[in-house]
Amino acid sequence: MRSSKNVIKEFMRFKVRMEGTVNGHEFEIEGEGEGRPYEGHNTVKLKVTKGGPLPFAWDILSPQFQYGSKVYVKHPADIPDYKKLSFPEGFKWERVMNFEDGGVVTVTQDSSLQDGCFIYKVKFIGVNFPSDGPVMQKKTMGWEASTERLYPRDGVLKGEIHKALKLKDGGHYLVEFKSIYMAKKPVQLPGYYYVDSKLDITSHNEDYTIVEQYERTEGRHHLFL
């Protein structure tokens, strides 16, 4: 980790811009955040700059800003921190999210470093969400805490996770995430390990065109190893 600390400091800021569509509705979001990459937490303030108020649940977007901000994951010393080690060149990731009612999201993200600030460029496409489902009816109430399993494959790092959105009328709405993380230079890959995450919306206006989020994340080995 010593080499990454030459580039990534104890406290870092980031800027994020998302362009996307959900069931054909176009939108753009911009935000600024900050946090402590080696302690595993960060916050971000976001604003819908085009297409608001959004006609779908904000929750399907929220993981792409912070669950997508992988440089803020705390790692133990014996697990190589693939994303931090990729800087200053940075890395990219791709993600597919399959929702239990047939909705599908594909996301691409580019993470770079400019003048000591992380820059995230995100493209988001959501399709096939039923008009009477939780997403289009805005019936979700945030994500449960979750654990991603990560493993090296074909020179990149892959991640898989089963996440659950809480519903206003009780119960859960299930989503399968599959992600691929790709450094822009040769980087030491970790073995098989886990990352625990908890993402919360800490404030928002009535129509969710201004939102603040907070996330805690930490990598670990399996508890029985």
Swiss-Prot record:
Keyword Cytoplasm part of the UniProt annotation: no
InterPro entries tied to this protein: GFP, GFP-related, Green_fluorescent_prot
Keyword annotations from UniProtKB, A to Z: Chromophore, Luminescence, Photoprotein
Gene3D superfamilies: 3.30.1300.40, Green fluorescent protein
GO BP: bioluminescence; generation of precursor metabolites and energy
Modified how: Contains a chromophore consisting of modified amino acid residues. The chromophore is formed by autocatalytic backbone condensation between Xaa-N and Gly-(N+2), oxidation of Tyr-(N+1) to didehydrotyrosine, and formation of a double bond to the alpha-amino nitrogen of residue Xaa-N. Maturation of the chromophore requires nothing other than molecular oxygen.
(Z)-2,3-didehydrotyrosine modified-residue sites: Y67
Annotated crosslink 2-iminomethyl-5-imidazolinone (Gln-Gly) location: Q66-G68
Biotech use, per record: Fluorescent proteins have become a useful and ubiquitous tool for making chimeric proteins, where they function as a fluorescent protein tag. Typically they tolerate N- and C-terminal fusion to a broad variety of proteins. They have been expressed in most known cell types and are used as a noninvasive fluorescent marker in living cells and organisms. They enable a wide range of applications where they have functioned as a cell lineage tracer, reporter of gene expression, or as a measure of protein-protein interactions.
Oligomer status and interactors: Homotetramer.
Similarity annotation: Belongs to the GFP family.
Function comment: Thought to play a role in photoprotection of the coral's resident symbiont microalgae's photosystems from photoinhibition caused by high light levels found near the surface of coral reefs. In deeper water, the fluorescence may be to convert blue light into longer wavelengths more suitable for use in photosynthesis by the microalgal symbionts.
Name assigned to this protein: Red fluorescent protein drFP583
Annotated source species: Discosoma sp. (Sea anemone)
Organism ancestry: Eukaryota, Metazoa, Cnidaria, Anthozoa, Hexacorallia
